[in-house]
């Protein structure tokens, strides 16, 4: 409730502190990321996955830029998105508000942790974050920086939590009385597993479908 009722100035302050502290701790972040990359090499992780889990100067610059852009956006809370007079003296308003507690489960992308955390802070939502084991060290230091920034901004410490153990996924799936929404990011089979093993509403996805339509009068070799 405190986070949902916080001012946009306080939430923006937290975001700016996150950006500032990410810059200040860049060397430590890169060092922890090297540990994840070394472990991935030992475990013979696929090259595509290793590319995603790498967190370098470019990705740090991108996430900080994203945070600054988020700060520049207006407050998403308390906006009247629909107003309708139902009867004399009776007006129905639809007002934007936080969802509540969002559980986000994602795979080997440490930059996703920063992006998700930032979006939750701006929108006044509490978050429970579970990243892939491939990015354990990077996620740990990134979360610590974000968590410390939240506290320094005066927001409650428990508005952002991190789950590290794989066993905690099933525990999270059972929290239908306290978690309002789950967002799994990963393979189709992973998303289907989440959807099939929880009573919590899931914002999931299936396999992407891409189509190309070519007019019969056009040369396919030019169109494709």
Predicted regions mapped to residue ranges:
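ALDH superfamily catalytic-core signature
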Residues: 108-111, 115-126, 141, 145, ...
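Active-site/ligand-binding-proximal alpha/beta "capping" segment
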Residues: 172-181, 187-191, 196, 220
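A structured beta-alpha segment of the ubiquitous adenosine-cofactor-binding alpha/beta core
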Residues: 56, 64, 87, 91-94, ...
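N-terminal Rossmann-like NAD(P)+-binding subdomain of aldehyde/semialdehyde dehydrogenases
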Residues: 1-91
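General beta-strand structural signal in soluble alpha/beta enzymes
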Residues: 79, 129-130, 161-164, 183-186, ...
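A glycine-rich helix N-cap at a beta->alpha junction
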Residues: 147-162
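Substrate-binding/gating loop at the entrance of the active-site cleft, primarily
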Residues: 83-127, 132-142
């Amino acid at each position: 409730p405190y986070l949902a009722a916080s001012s946009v100035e306080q939430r923006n302050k937290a975001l700016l502190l996150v950006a500032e502290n990410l810059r200040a701790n860049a060397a430590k972040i890169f060092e922890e990321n090297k540990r994840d990359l070394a472990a991935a090499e030992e475990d013979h992780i696929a090259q595509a996955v290793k590319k995603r889990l790498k967190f370098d100067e470019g990705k740090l610059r991108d996430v900080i830029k994203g945070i600054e852009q988020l700060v520049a956006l207006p407050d998403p809370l308390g906006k009247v998105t629909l107003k309708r007079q139902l009867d004399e003296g009776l007006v129905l308003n639809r007002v934007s508000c936080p969802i509540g507690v969002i559980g986000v489960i994602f795979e080997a992308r440490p930059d996703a942790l920063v992006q998700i955390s930032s979006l939750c802070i701006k929108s006044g939502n509490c978050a429970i974050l579970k990243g892939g084991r491939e990015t354990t060290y990077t996620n740990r230091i990134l979360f610590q920086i974000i968590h410390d920034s939240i506290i320094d901004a005066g927001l409650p410490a428990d508005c952002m939590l991190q789950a590290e153990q794989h066993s905690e996924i099933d525990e999270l799936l059972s929290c239908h009385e306290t978690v309002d929404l789950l967002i799994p990011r990963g393979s189709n089979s992973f998303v289907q597993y989440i959807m099939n093993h929880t009573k919590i509403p899931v914002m999931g996805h299936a396999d992407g479908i891409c189509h190309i339509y070519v007019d019969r009068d056009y040369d396919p070799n030019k169109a494709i």
